[in-house]
């Protein structure tokens, strides 16, 4: 439900940018161009609204976006605006995982932000509906809204339905894309045969939509709701569900209403809104990538969010959602029990949510929750706070002699509070994968993968291929993996990423050697290499040469900042 424009609406210019292309003698040529795409004399007083979509048919994540863009266009028209649609890129992490393509994943976030900025500024658009489906496209769109500070509404493509597989042994089970990565590890370890591997491959993606667990895409869709940048309830309906078309139409209406009220993205993206988003991520046990992305969105919004804010909130907010990759359920199940508003409502009742923040509806979060009346947690998919899965949030920031500027762990996956063991050091992911395939990874080891950070990778690759292979080979609870790279939202096991400073910046991880004892204490939020600092720094260091000397990743490596700052450029 939208708040109607107030009495002072007549004082607000609903065309704060586009008058330069629709009014006056100087706009003759631009009006002529706009007439060719369908505008006419009756349209010059209407606000021009960008419909920015990351649609493509490379990956199922984005297939619904063309349909949803049509709904958003219709909503803009209905509210008195004029929609102008354009597309930007999107990278499929599922397809790029485990090979050179993964270097290009995180940089795609920046390319998306830059490209949306470029079009909105070049074409003088007044507002924008942002549509995205795959992992990096969601934060990329939100970063663009924050940077430009225009009236903006975000809409998610929706998630995929789970697949179902029957194995040769007769076992039937629900599967997601993560099962395929783990099946590869199981196959290499001789635990399953090629026939079962093929059955899993054919079952994991039964249709359109983003990966179905509480992986990065669904985490960031939930974040968008919690920030107030999406209409409440819009994150959880599946991609193919026609409720999405209704949300698309309403999103188009909403952006015009925001213009009429003079509300822009930074009015919504306040420090309190980011605290709400962190609380939701902690309660859901969401992806560690949310740390990077929230820091980056906050940077664009000029909000002083730091990596330390995550522990401040996570130490108070329990983990209550039993969702994959560690739990039993997927986003479709969250939708079945009331969606993300159920989580926000539960958090608000416990005092973990700022209810007075404004949302894209023009109303406060508390008003929206009251109007929706989402009900209470069902006790299975979403637990109550009296019976949480874990007493603190699902993500923790660690600091210590190995990561003075911080590291990030998804603590929902840790069965042990303390892990201590000898380091097995690998320069880049491929070397670690080769060692695992050769059977050289031993129980009790701490696998250290370095030179995979934002600058050193470059691109801070996700380590899903190696972590899934570790789990598939039966070592998931017996080894700890540390990296200055990052992890997929679907990663399971004992994994700590985002170690900063990264190796290429001569962080302590660059000086670690095989056999060094590393100790992680989740309860104390500490991560240490048990070697005297002077001894560590005295070691000879020969970093590998830059992997890319031209192209987008060469540019990126020269601009990108630390993971502890959100890997911003």
UniProtKB/Swiss-Prot annotation:
Sorted keywords for this record are:
2Fe-2S, Amino-acid biosynthesis, Branched-chain amino acid biosynthesis, Iron, Iron-sulfur, Lyase, Magnesium, Metal-binding
N6-carboxylysine: residues bearing it: 136
SUPFAM superfamilies (UniProt xref): IlvD/EDD N-terminal domain-like, LeuD/IlvD-like
Superkingdom of origin: Bacteria
Entry GO MF terms = 2 iron, 2 sulfur cluster binding; dihydroxy-acid dehydratase activity; magnesium ion binding
Q: Which InterPro entries match?
A: DHAD_IlvD/Edd, Dihydro-acid_dehy_C, DihydroxyA_deHydtase, DiOHA_6PGluconate_deHydtase_CS, ILV_EDD_C, ILV_EDD_N, IlvD/EDD_N
Entry-linked Gene3D superfamilies: IlvD/EDD C-terminal domain-like
Q: How is the cofactor bound?
A: Binds 1 [2Fe-2S] cluster per subunit. This cluster acts as a Lewis acid cofactor.
* BP terms from Gene Ontology: isoleucine biosynthetic process; L-valine biosynthetic process
Which cofactors are required for activity? [2Fe-2S] cluster; Mg(2+)
* Catalytic residues (UniProt): 488
Q: Which residues bind Mg(2+)?
A: 93, 135-136, 462
* Keyword Cell membrane in record: no
EC number(s) on file: 4.2.1.9
Annotated residues for binding of [2Fe-2S] cluster: 61, 134, 211
Pfam annotation, one family: ILV_EDD_C
The pathway to which it is assigned is:
Amino-acid biosynthesis; L-isoleucine biosynthesis; L-isoleucine from 2-oxobutanoate: step 3/4; Amino-acid biosynthesis; L-valine biosynthesis; L-valine from pyruvate: step 3/4
Reaction(s) this enzyme catalyzes, per UniProt: (2R)-2,3-dihydroxy-3-methylbutanoate = 3-methyl-2-oxobutanoate + H2O; (2R,3R)-2,3-dihydroxy-3-methylpentanoate = (S)-3-methyl-2-oxopentanoate + H2O
Family, according to the entry, reads as follows: Belongs to the IlvD/Edd family.
Q: What does this protein do?
A: Functions in the biosynthesis of branched-chain amino acids. Catalyzes the dehydration of (2R,3R)-2,3-dihydroxy-3-methylpentanoate (2,3-dihydroxy-3-methylvalerate) into 2-oxo-3-methylpentanoate (2-oxo-3-methylvalerate) and of (2R)-2,3-dihydroxy-3-methylbutanoate (2,3-dihydroxyisovalerate) into 2-oxo-3-methylbutanoate (2-oxoisovalerate), the penultimate precursor to L-isoleucine and L-valine, respectively.
Its quaternary structure? Homodimer.
Q: What is this protein called?
A: Dihydroxy-acid dehydratase
To which species is this protein native?
Tropheryma whipplei (strain TW08/27)
């Amino acid at each position: 439900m939208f708040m109607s424009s107030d009495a002072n609406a007549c004082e607000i210019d609903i065309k704060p940018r586009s008058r330069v292309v629709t009014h006056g003698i100087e706009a003759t040529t631009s009006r002529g161009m706009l007439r060719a795409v369908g505008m006419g004399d009756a349209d010059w007083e209407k606000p021009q609204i960008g419909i920015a979509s990351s649609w493509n048919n490379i990956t199922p994540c984005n297939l619904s976006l063309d349909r949803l863009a049509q709904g958003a266009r219709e909503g803009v028209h209905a509210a008195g605006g004029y929609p102008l649609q354009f597309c930007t890129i999107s990278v499929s992490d599922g397809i790029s995982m485990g090979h050179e393509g993964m270097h290009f994943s995180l940089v795609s976030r920046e390319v998306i932000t830059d490209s949306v900025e470029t079009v909105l500024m070049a074409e003088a658009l007044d507002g924008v509906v942002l549509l995205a489906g795959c992992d990096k496209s969601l934060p990329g769109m939100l970063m663009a809204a924050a940077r430009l500070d225009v009236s903006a509404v975000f809409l998610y493509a929706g998630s995929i339905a789970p697949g179902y597989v029957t194995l040769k042994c007769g076992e039937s089970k629900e599967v997601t894309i993560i099962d395929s990565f783990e099946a590869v590890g199981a196959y290499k370890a001789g635990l399953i045969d090629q026939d079962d591997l093929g059955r899993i491959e054919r079952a994991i993606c039964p249709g359109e939509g983003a990966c179905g667990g509480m992986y990065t895409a669904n985490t960031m869709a939930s974040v968008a709701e919690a920030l107030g940048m999406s209409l409440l309830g819009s994150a959880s309906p599946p991609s193919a569900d026609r409720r999405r078309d209704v949300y698309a139409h309403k999103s188009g209406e909403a952006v015009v209403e925001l213009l009429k009220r003079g509300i822009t993205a930074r009015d919504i993206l306040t420090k309190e809104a980011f605290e709400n988003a962190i609380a939701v991520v902690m309660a859901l046990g969401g992806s560690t990538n949310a740390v990077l992305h929230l820091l980056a969105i906050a940077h664009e919004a000029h909000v002083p969010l730091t990596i330390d804010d995550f522990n401040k909130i996570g130490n108070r907010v329990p983990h209550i959602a039993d969702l994959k990759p560690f739990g039993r359920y997927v986003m479709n199940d969250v939708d079945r029990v009331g969606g993300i508003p159920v989580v926000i409502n539960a958090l608000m009742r416990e005092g973990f949510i700022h209810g007075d923040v404004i949302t894209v509806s023009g109303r406060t979060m508390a008003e929206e929750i009251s109007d929706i009346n989402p009900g209470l947690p069902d006790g299975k998919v979403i637990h109550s706070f009296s019976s949480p899965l874990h007493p603190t949030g699902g993500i923790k920031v660690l600091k210590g002699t190995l990561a003075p500027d911080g590291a990030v762990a998804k603590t929902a996956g840790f069965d042990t509070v303390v892990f201590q063991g000898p380091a097995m050091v690998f320069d880049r992911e491929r070397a670690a994968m080769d060692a695992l395939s050769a059977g050289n990874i031993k129980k009790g080891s701490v696998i250290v993968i370095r030179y995979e950070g934002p600058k050193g990778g470059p691109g801070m690759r996700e380590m899903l291929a190696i972590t899934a292979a570790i789990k598939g080979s039966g070592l998931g609870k017996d080894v700890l993996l540390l990296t200055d790279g990052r992890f997929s939202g679907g990663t399971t096991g004992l994994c700590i990423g985002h170690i900063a400073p990264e190796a290429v910046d001569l962080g302590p991880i660059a000086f670690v050697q095989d056999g060094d004892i590393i100790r992680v204490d989740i309860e104390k939020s500490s991560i240490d290499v048990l070697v005297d600092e002077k001894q560590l720094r005295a070691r000879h260091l020969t970093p590998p040469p830059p992997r890319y000397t031209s192209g987008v990743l060469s540019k990126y490596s020269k601009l990108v900042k630390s993971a502890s700052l959100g890997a911003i450029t």
